[in-house]
């Protein structure tokens, strides 16, 4: 009898726990994806902060020339970074217990792998949590689909690119100047500026910013008048009030006259679908571009493609970019090679 009561009580406790995890009444929705997400992102964030402040130099190129990235070793917010794992580690899974000591783990850049892998799993779980909450509220799944674009981009630079290049040392450093260094080296080795998928990504980011600004300014300008003609239209409103204040027909008419009729949406759902789809699809393409360049399927090469009737090269901007690429190529990892293979 006692055993039966204990089993029933424990089953009841588990059911209450499940209800609490999946409840949409909580101030912060947890969900089953959240059970994974919260510890993963807390771990990644904690290790990032500690390593950014105090991690010792890392032998990133595997040639016994450590590179310092933390604040306590002379960096500032701009120059500081979590330095990627050593080329000596390559793609090996390198948790703390695989190293002979914590000092060795730090010297070989173990924190980078720890942060990146926990972060990628964490943001994937965040995407799953978005879907889970949408599902429980009876919503459609497009919020999680939209979030898949930055998840794909992060996965491309932190995981797919190192896999393609054969080492986590080729991943993007976790810092401001480290990000710029990654971009410059990526251009030198893969000519990303001449890749159509990167061009789509630029169109997505800048176009998305433009469309967002245009939409926001149109909505806040197309007020439904609540005052007489002799008063300012602004007098009829309070900033941040809850009920709808704009007229999409007026906004459509304004924008149609500003550019041309069919450049303007008169359907709110079509408009918002476009605002979501444009940057998301373009960033998907960029992530796909990074993932193909990871395996050295690079941007277009138009070097010396224009010649005169005598066969002499007429330089184009492609040749200017090529010369810049060569300069960046010989500058990075300056002591790792006697002569860069790319130039041989």
From Swiss-Prot:
Residues bound to a quinone: 215, 264-265
Pfam families, alphabetized: Photo_RC (PF00124)
Annotated chlorophyll a ChlzD1 binding sites: 118
EC code: 1.10.3.9
GO biological process, alphabetically ordered: photosynthetic electron transport in photosystem II; response to herbicide
Subcellular location: Plastid, Chloroplast thylakoid membrane
Modification sites for Phosphothreonine: 2
Function: Photosystem II (PSII) is a light-driven water:plastoquinone oxidoreductase that uses light energy to abstract electrons from H(2)O, generating O(2) and a proton gradient subsequently used for ATP formation. It consists of a core antenna complex that captures photons, and an electron transfer chain that converts photonic excitation into a charge separation. The D1/D2 (PsbA/PsbD) reaction center heterodimer binds P680, the primary electron donor of PSII as well as several subsequent electron acceptors.
HAMAP family documented for this protein: PSII_PsbA_D1 (MF_01379)
Protein name: Photosystem II protein D1
Gene giving rise to this polypeptide: psbA
């Amino acid at each position: 009898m006692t055993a039966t009561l204990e089993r029933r009580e424990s089953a009841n406790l588990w059911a209450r726990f499940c209800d609490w995890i999946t409840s949409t009444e909580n101030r912060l929705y947890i969900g089953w994806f959240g059970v994974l997400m919260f510890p993963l992102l807390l771990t990644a964030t904690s290790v990032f902060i500690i390593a950014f402040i105090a991690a010792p130099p890392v032998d990133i190129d595997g040639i016994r020339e450590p590179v310092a990235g933390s604040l306590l070793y002379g960096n500032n917010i701009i120059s500081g970074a979590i330095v990627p794992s050593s080329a000596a580690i390559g793609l090996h899974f390198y948790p703390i217990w695989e190293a002979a000591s914590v000092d060795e783990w730090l010297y070989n850049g173990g924190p980078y792998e720890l942060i990146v892998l926990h972060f990628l799993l964490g943001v994937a779980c965040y995407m799953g949590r978005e879907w889970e909450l949408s599902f429980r509220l009876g919503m459609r799944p497009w919020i999680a689909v939209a979030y898949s674009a930055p998840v794909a981009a992060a996965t491309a630079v932190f995981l797919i690119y190192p896999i393609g290049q054969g080492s986590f040392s080729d991943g993007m450093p976790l810092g401001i100047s480290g990000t710029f260094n990654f971009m410059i080296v990526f251009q030198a080795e893969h000519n990303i500026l001449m890749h159509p998928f990167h061009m789509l990504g630029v169109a997505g980011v800048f176009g998305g910013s433009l469309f967002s600004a245009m939409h926001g300014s149109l909505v806040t300008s197309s007020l439904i008048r609540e005052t007489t003609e002799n008063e300012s239209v602004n007098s009829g409103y309070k900033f941040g009030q809850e009920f709808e204040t704009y007229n999409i027909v007026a906004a459509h008419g304004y924008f149609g006259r500003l550019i041309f009729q069919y450049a303007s949406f008169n359907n709110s759902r079509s408009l918002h679908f476009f605002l979501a789809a444009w940057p998301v699809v373009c960033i998907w393409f960029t992530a796909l571009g990074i993932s193909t360049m990871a395996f050295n399927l690079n941007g277009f090469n138009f070097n010396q493609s224009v010649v005169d009737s005598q066969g002499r090269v007429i330089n184009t901007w492609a040749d200017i970019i090529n010369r810049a690429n060569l300069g960046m190529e010989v500058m990075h990892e300056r002591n790792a090679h006697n002569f860069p293979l790319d130039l041989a």
